[in-house]
């Protein structure tokens, strides 16, 4: 009962053919094939396009580290402020 035999699949195929008819099934399979072809074409187009389209030059191993104004120097921890235990507010 756990595995499906060939006869189960034949019966399922016959029921599908009766419900949808020969024209609908072939039309559906054609649409699936067109979708697969379009997907493959899209994947091939992505491979031919250059991946680096930004104008920012890549950072080399000897370039200095750039920091934003609100950041500290690299390797320093931000200042921690102490809040007394009774002053916490629920959000």
From Swiss-Prot:
One of its GO terms (cellular component) is TAT protein transport complex. Belongs to the TatA/E family. The keyword Protein transport applies. InterPro entries: TatA/B/E, TatA/E. The keyword Endoplasmic reticulum does not apply. NCBIfam families: PRK00720.1, tatAE. Part of the twin-arginine translocation (Tat) system that transports large folded proteins containing a characteristic twin-arginine motif in their signal peptide across membranes. TatA could form the protein-conducting channel of the Tat system. Its main location: membrane. This is Sec-independent protein translocase protein TatA. Pfam families: TatA_B_E. It is found in: Cell inner membrane. One of its GO terms (biological process) is protein transport by the Tat complex. The chain crosses the membrane at residues 1-21. Residues 42-91 are annotated as: Disordered. It comes from the Bacteria.
């Amino acid at each position: 009962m756990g595995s499906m035999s060939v006869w189960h699949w034949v019966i399922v195929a016959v029921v599908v053919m009766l419900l949808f008819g020969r024209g609908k099934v072939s039309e559906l399979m054609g649409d699936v094939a067109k979708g697969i072809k379009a997907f493959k074409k899209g994947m091939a187009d992505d491979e031919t396009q250059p991946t680096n389209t930004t104008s920012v030059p890549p950072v080399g191993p000897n370039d200095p580290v750039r920091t934003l104004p609100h950041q500290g120097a690299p390797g320093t921890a931000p200042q921690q402020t102490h809040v007394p235990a009774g002053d916490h507010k629920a959000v």
